[in-house]
């Protein structure tokens, strides 16, 4: 399934095995996953007790950022992140506050936009800290692989030759 909107998912219970843009991931409890607009998602399997919370937002919903930057900071290997207890509690507070605000009448668009932007910035901060952990650095081969996957996801509708991707790498 190709997503039209970006999504933020919190794994609450159980386990799910998914592919995001050809890469397989496992989502467990206390996991946060972000999916870019245009991502290709496939649910491979899930346990009977699997439960998620999800926020979906059109790329044009956050005018304070350029539409193509909505989930920009969550590309490549940082799509799925296991978080600490403190980070998990904070993400729960964001989800609850966003949900409660969405239910208000009249709809408070700007408030929801800024809360969502704050949540995305917090996820970016968590992942930046994770990326700075030198024990998690990628090999040169892994970096090339991730660049290749990103190129396929960006150009696969129009480009289908190996030569095109080889030139880009």
What are these regions (language model features)?
Residues 44-52, 56, 119-136:
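Repeat-unit-sized solenoid/scaffold elements
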Residues 57-62, 87, 166-169:
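Juxtamembrane/interfacial segments around transmembrane helices
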Residues 3-8, 41, 65, 114-116, ...:
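Short acidic/polar alpha-helix capping motifs at helix-coil junctions
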Residues 73-118, 122-127, 150:
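Amphipathic alpha-helical segments enriched in hydrophobic/aromatic residues interleaved with Lys/Arg
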């Amino acid at each position: 399934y190709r997503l039209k909107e970006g999504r933020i998912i919190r794994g609450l219970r159980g386990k799910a095995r998914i592919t995001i843009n050809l890469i397989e991931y496992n989502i467990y409890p206390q996991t946060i996953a972000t999916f870019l607009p245009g991502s290709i998602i496939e649910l491979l399997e899930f346990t009977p007790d699997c439960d998620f919370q999800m926020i979906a937002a059109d790329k044009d919903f956050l005018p304070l950022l350029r539409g193509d930057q909505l989930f920009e900071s969550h590309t490549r290997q940082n799509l799925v992140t296991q978080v600490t207890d403190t980070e998990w509690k904070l993400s729960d507070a964001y989800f609850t506050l966003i949900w409660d605000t969405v239910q208000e009448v009249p709809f408070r668009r700007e408030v929801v936009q800024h809360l969502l932007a704050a949540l995305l910035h917090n996820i970016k901060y968590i992942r930046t800290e994770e990326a700075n952990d030198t024990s998690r650095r990628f090999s040169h081969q892994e970096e090339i692989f991730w660049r290749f996957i990103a190129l396929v996801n960006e150009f696969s509708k129009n480009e289908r030759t190996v030569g095109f991707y080889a030139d880009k790498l």
